Amino acid sequence: MPIFSNNTGSDAVAGSMTAPEPATATTGRGSNAGKGSGQSESVVRSAGVVSMAVLMSRVTGLLRESVMARLFGAGLIYDAFMLGFRIPNLTRDLFAEGALSSAFVPTFTDYLANRGKEAAARLANLVATALILVVGVVCALGVIFAPQLVHLMAPGFAAVPGKFELAVRMTRTMFPFLLLVALAAQAMGVLNASNKFGVPALASTFFNLGSVGFGVVLGIWLGPSLHLTRIEGMAIGVVLGGALQLVWQLPLLYRLGFRFRAAFDWQHPGLVRIFRLMVPAILGNAAVQINVMVNTNFASTIVDPVRGMDGPVSWLSYAFRFMQLPLGLFGVAMASATLPSISRSAAAGNMDEFRRTLSKSLGMVFLLTVPSSVGLAVLGKSIIGAIYQGGRFQLYDTQQTSVALSFYAIGLAGYAALKVLNPAFYALDDARTPMLVSLGSIGVNFATAEIMIRAAGMGHAGLALSTSVVALFGFLLLFEILRRRIGGIHGRDLARGIGKVLLASLVMAGATALSSHGVERWLGVSQLARLADLVISIPVGLLVFYGMCRALGVDEVDMAISAFTRPVSRRFRRKTSL
């Protein structure tokens, strides 16, 4: 039975596959260079589309966190809420931006290109059915064993009256979010494999808006009549926001002809291949999130001289949330746009094109994330103060969160590069190597965190630094393994470009620091002064960085600007022409 309905016509599906077919990528050595270059630029353009959508997602995510900060501050209630959200949120990062997409997209692309759209659609239905069954069971187990999970992740919560019990309630309330986000991740994979990037990238925006909107309605407006506390309403809002994230993608799937039909065939070779890639990929792609969980365990036991045991978990969470803005904007966007292209190259056996595309993607990641990390470190206090401070989020919270943000920023480039490198291994049908590196990095993180807290006495800042060290460790090790396996990744050109970006970023750091210091002396440290600092210092830093890149011959900077502004300008021209 066809699953891609003929109602839309075969051209509707074929027309969406605008990237070069695998067969055309090997039509002669002489043409490959041009096509490889074209594919690399196509990846950057696709990343631009994704990045604009991801920008909206991250901005609305910050809006959600800002509302939470003002309502609950950084303390017992938000610590418990964040722990309850962390388990399904970990799964979101693994599925939506990692393991499922990395395992499903190459397999689905292979079926779509070599076996036809009906075979590919049947595979998609098999995966969706399996997810409903498997993840549904996991959700049930999570609700039952919530107390044990909370104790495992945050043993220090039991020392604060009421904190452990609230965290258990939050965990049980938000666990169904896991199933919704798993299905949303698969829908994202189908659309990305069909070269539809904007709609799935916007899905997280609808989650953010839905979670805060439903949460405010249920927790504040209707809370008294429904006998819900504010934090309980926000927890239910998370689940409803997850449902909205899935529903947003369904119309485009329908227009492509996709119809869900329950299908059972556990021996299907495509499903077996996906699970074979996915199980180790969960570990191989989970280093950052697992290390955050390890750090949560450590953070729950830290005694702050001012706040006691309430605060460190919240400070780390708020800081890491802001870190996700450039990470999602650049790292996840490049990974989402790169994976289908390198999957086609790997399926066609065209390793020259594979190397070119991967090198271009990594170079673009460093071009965008290195200056971002410098900006986060230099302007951390102004960023956190302008966005979070107010209500129950006090000046002391701003100071402690900005310290964590500065140390997280050290590993930003490593975080983002891992988003591109891990899928490259999966495209080569190798999930074992990232898994082993990830397991090793978890041990490195545990040892580093022990040193930072016990020996150095750095508190929550040491935990942020240990996470960054692990991200850089994982990137360097995976890069070297992949370089040897595929015979190079244009390493000299890549290193030369990164060196230029580092130099430009250092000059930018000096200019931004001078600007920020001048604004502080002029206006002080009020929230208005923080906003003024960002309005003045960010453009100064960007202009200096752009000028240095042009002076050093970093031509990719113009390509990046074009890629990330074209979607907006095209939409603006379309509206003005109406």
Report the location of each language-model feature:
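Membrane-embedded alpha-helical bundles of multi-pass transporters/translocases
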Residues: P2-L578
